[in-house]
């Protein structure tokens, strides 16, 4: 298990402090919440002379079509978006029909797609 530090969790609102922390903390890997954001991050890092995965490993979530068109190809979690959508619609229909009112835990399987944006350390 890899621990993260709350002060190293960034959003689009805190991107400027991300840039500062990147130089201060020198991480080996970055976890990004979406493939499109990862694409933009990789482009920005490349413009700074930073190479992926040589300098930083990057992993993302979603396994969108962007993951296979960027360079390097993006290592990403496939979160099974179709099944997630189907389950959401089932739940919504059940609520609208008053068939289900109690919260219910639903687990949608996901898996890691290993490509080129991560290296061993």
Model-identified regions with their sequence ranges:
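Bacterial carbohydrate/catabolite-sensing allosteric modules
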Residues: 1-121
